[in-house]
């Protein structure tokens, strides 16, 4: 989809009680200013438009599938797939796991990511434009200044986040070619051709600029700073515009996203500075407490498999259990099944760590497509309603507990507090940086080990950090980008596909007939092609 052909279309999420409890949509395609002005003539109209952005981000083309648990994790060699299946979906998975970006279904999925990404970005620009009008007297003037700042901060962060992930997917390995072809950065509400900018320009001049502006606005306005995420329904006022902050790009999520972007650009000093805003503030851990092992492991009815108390940002999916059923296990034993190879999870990923809470709660016995014993991921499993039935007629305090239980059963994580500790650890472990301090690096990593019931199983820092990214973020979209950032090999210890260093398998698109694959050849795994129609007529 060409940027110039994207029609401004605000997908309005209808507000009924809970912020994200409804799935009805109103598609709005203004052909004149009157309908746009009507949309933004009330405070509810602004919130409906903003909720529409988050709902689009949670769609399959972005973070609800391709950029979380499916395409991006298959590219990251997390699973085995049916290598002999002849149906279109099997061929799609075969192409992904071999980094074959020429497959028609893969190209279609990439085009969907690109098109939906830029369409959503344009809609954030429409909202940002109307926020300015509302504040400077050109609009209806319906928003208090605090809410103007909060919504503007969220939309700047959303615009930056989507651009950043498009850059990470379609751009080069940054440290190898920062001046390489990047992507357009769209700040306009008009349909026009935008220049494709160098990667470094997109990252430093636009993405980080927007994130720092968002941080400043949210620091002055976000209730998460004083009241935490407030993941419960307000039964008194029925106004949830300031609640469920984990479903919004709140201040803390924006800080983590900024740290993530600095790390991508190799700026360890600033990455550490941003990460420490989260790791060094005791209030943050109070608002986003580590999962309680007793509650997690002792609860067979409705455990918090997503570790939602620690999540800074994610999305709502009332049908989360279907992801598990159709993709990771449940009733699925067919070609769509994604499970790691036999022996990988317990024999390598969690080797010497059988007490790790993630191993004990997020994985269960299953089998590969060829019938060998394996482990299957259950973090997306449906949470039963037994506890809800037992609480009928309960007191208001119990009702609040009930709301939290319902929340963690429908929540899917995109950002966890633990990532701030990993970023701080990597920054301080980088030789040559001004913040190099291996004692500090190990301390940051140890804090996560302690919160997971894990032990430090070796003195190889990079090996343990790599395994931590896989253990922590499988199904959440970060593992592929971790390997891309480092141009790192998927050797035996890090791939769930097969017990071999993947890079030396003959027949893969980048294989160069050498035992040791070149860095240039390895880089090809990680760079998705821009849609053909985006490059036409430029």
Predicted segment positions?
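Conserved, well-structured interaction surfaces
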Residues: 90-170, 197-202, 216-218, 404-412, ...
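Short, surface-exposed recognition loops and adjoining beta-strand edges that mediate ligand/DNA contacts
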Residues: 37, 67-76, 81, 172-179, ...
């Amino acid at each position: 989809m060409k940027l110039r052909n994207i029609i401004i279309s605000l997908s309005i999420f209808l507000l009924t009680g809970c912020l994200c409890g409804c799935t009805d949509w109103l598609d709005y395609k203004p052909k004149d200013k009157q309908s746009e002005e009507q949309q933004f003539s009330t405070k509810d109209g602004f919130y409906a438009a903003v909720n529409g952005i988050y709902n689009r981000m949670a769609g399959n083309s972005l973070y609800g599938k391709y950029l979380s648990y499916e395409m991006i994790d298959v590219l990251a060699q997390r699973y085995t797939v049916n290598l002999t299946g002849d149906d279109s979906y099997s061929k799609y998975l075969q192409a992904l796991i071999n980094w074959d970006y020429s497959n028609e279904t893969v190209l279609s999925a990439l085009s969907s990511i690109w098109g939906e990404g830029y369409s959503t970005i344009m809609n954030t620009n429409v909202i940002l434009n109307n926020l300015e009008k509302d504040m400077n007297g050109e609009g209806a003037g319906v928003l208090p200044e605090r809410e103007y700042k909060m919504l503007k901060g969220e939309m700047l962060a959303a615009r930056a986040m989507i651009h950043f992930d498009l850059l990470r997917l379609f751009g080069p390995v940054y440290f190898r070619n920062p001046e390489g072809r990047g992507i357009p950065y769209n700040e306009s509400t008009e349909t026009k051709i935008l220049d494709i900018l160098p990667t470094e320009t997109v990252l430093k001049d636009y993405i980080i600029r927007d994130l720092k502006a968002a941080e400043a606005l949210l620091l002055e306005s976000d209730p998460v700073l004083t009241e935490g995420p407030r993941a419960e329904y307000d039964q008194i006022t029925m106004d949830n515009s300031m609640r469920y902050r984990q479903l919004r790009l709140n201040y803390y999520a924006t800080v983590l996203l900024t740290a993530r972007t600095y790390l991508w650009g190799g700026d360890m000093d600033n990455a550490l500075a941003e990460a420490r805003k989260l790791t060094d503030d005791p209030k943050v851990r109070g608002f986003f407490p580590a999962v309680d092992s007793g509650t997690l492991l002792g609860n067979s009815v409705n455990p918090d498999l997503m570790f939602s108390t620690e999540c800074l940002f994610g999305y709502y999916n009332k049908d989360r259990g279907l992801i598990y059923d159709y993709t990771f296990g449940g009733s699925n034993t067919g070609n769509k099944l994604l499970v790691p190879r036999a022996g990988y999870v317990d024999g390598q990923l969690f080797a010497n760590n059988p007490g790790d809470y993630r191993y004990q709660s997020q994985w269960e016995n299953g089998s590969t497509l060829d019938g060998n014993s394996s482990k299957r991921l259950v973090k997306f499993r449906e949470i039963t309603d037994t506890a809800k039935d037992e609480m009928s007629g309960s007191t208001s305090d119990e009702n609040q507990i009930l709301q939290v239980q319902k929340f963690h059963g429908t929540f899917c994580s995109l950002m966890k507090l633990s990532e701030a500790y990993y970023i701080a650890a990597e920054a301080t472990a980088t030789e040559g940086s001004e913040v190099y301090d291996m004692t500090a690096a190990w301390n940051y990593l140890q804090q996560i080990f302690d919160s997971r019931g894990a032990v430090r199983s070796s003195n190889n820092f990079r090996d343990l950090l790599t395994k931590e990214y896989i253990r922590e973020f499988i199904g959440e979209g970060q593992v592929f980008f971790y390997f891309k950032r480092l141009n790192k090999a998927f050797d035996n210890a890090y791939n769930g596909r097969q017990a071999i260093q993947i890079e030396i398998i003959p027949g893969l698109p980048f294989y160069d007939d050498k035992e040791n694959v070149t860095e240039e050849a390895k880089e090809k795994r990680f760079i998705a092609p821009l849609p053909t129609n985006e490059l036409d007529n430029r």
